[in-house]
């Protein structure tokens, strides 16, 4: 990987654009996930597109309207829609309706747990259904902004206005409240289960050290953080929202408190989405001008995956072993990179 400074042109960055298989989806994309050898592109309306290694497209209808959220555990893609349904599609393209909101409210957020449990939200209510089919619900003070399961145990983080709630659905005790003024829109646990981080409506992140609820404020962004990804070992949290990838250090017991973040892959435009390699300290970053870079976190070395002059990048995902990268922009122009 070669390096280019903030003013460096794309011509100075080593290119692997010739390894990309282009895919034209013809419709906006909100996220992409891998199920076995297929990249599954989640559209904004009604269906997902299965794309194989050769770039052949097969569409699967999942919702009767807009798709508002989607997550994957590598076995299935679970999505929520404005039809009030939580829907799963597996690697074979088989579709199952997992839940339907009794009031047909929009399903705003979804989350998956390793043991087969899943969570979803509608309005102020978060729901969890265990792998055994037992369903629980919890109402929080305001509309749910994000959901995330802890890496250990059946514990759900629920982001909302003025903080987050930590809930053990299988326990009768009062859920734990973590407070911070403002609207929290996304939430993630660190892989070692020591920290919780939320993305705020304002251009900032907020975090808590779970052992003592100590606050961690991560600010200075010119725009909202819409994408967060943990590095393979959990040492860094990579984020969008600035004209470089901001990577906060989380290796020490204090996390990023008192430390400066790394600023990787600077460009004249903002990063829109980030995805960390599952095995190595490498990330992919997409930008407002359509550029996609692959970046080595150790020294900032860069490879050009896609040139600028395109709509903003909307989705990035690695497959399980990190040998393939899928991407798409807001207009549905996509690609598959084989390494």
Regions found by a protein language model. Give the residues of each.
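WD40-repeat beta-propeller superdomains and closely related acidic/aromatic-rich repeat-like regions
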Residues: 1-339
């Amino acid at each position: 990987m070669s390096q280019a400074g903030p003013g460096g042109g794309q011509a100075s960055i080593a290119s692997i654009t010739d390894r990309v298989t282009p895919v034209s989806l013809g419709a906006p994309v909100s996220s992409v996930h891998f199920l076995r050898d297929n990249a599954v592109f989640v559209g904004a309306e009604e269906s997902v597109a299965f794309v194989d290694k050769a770039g052949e497209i097969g569409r699967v209808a999942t919702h009767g309207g807009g798709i508002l959220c989607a997550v994957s555990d590598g076995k299935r893609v679970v999505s929520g829609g404005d039809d009030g349904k939580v829907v799963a599609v597996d690697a074979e393209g088989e579709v199952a309706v997992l839940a339907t909101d009794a009031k047909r409210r929009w399903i705003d957020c979804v989350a998956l747990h390793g043991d087969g449990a899943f969570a979803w939200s509608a309005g102020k209510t978060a729901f969890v259904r265990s792998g055994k089919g037992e369903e629980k619900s919890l109402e929080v003070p305001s509309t749910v902004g994000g959901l995330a399961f802890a890496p250990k145990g059946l514990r759900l983080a629920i982001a909302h206005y003025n903080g987050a709630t930590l809930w053990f659905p299988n326990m009768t005790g009062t859920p734990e409240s973590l407070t911070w003024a403002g609207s929290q829109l996304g939430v993630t646990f660190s892989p070692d289960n020591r920290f919780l981080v939320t993305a705020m409506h304002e251009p900032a992140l907020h975090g808590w050290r779970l052992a003592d609820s100590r606050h961690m404020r991560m600010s200075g962004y010119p725009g909202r953080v819409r994408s967060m990804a943990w590095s393979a070992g959990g040492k860094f949290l990579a984020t969008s929202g600035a004209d470089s990838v901001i990577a906060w250090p989380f290796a020490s017991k204090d996390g990023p408190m008192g430390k400066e973040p790394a600023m990787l892959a600077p460009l004249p435009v903002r990063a829109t989405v980030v995805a960390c390699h599952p095995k190595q300290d490498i990330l992919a970053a997409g930008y407002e001008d359509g550029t996609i870079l692959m970046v080595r976190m150790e020294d900032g070395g860069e490879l050009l995956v896609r040139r600028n002059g395109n709509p903003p990048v909307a989705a990035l995902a690695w497959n399980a072993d990190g040998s393939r990268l899928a991407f798409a922009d807001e207009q549905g122009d996509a690609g598959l990179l084989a390494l």
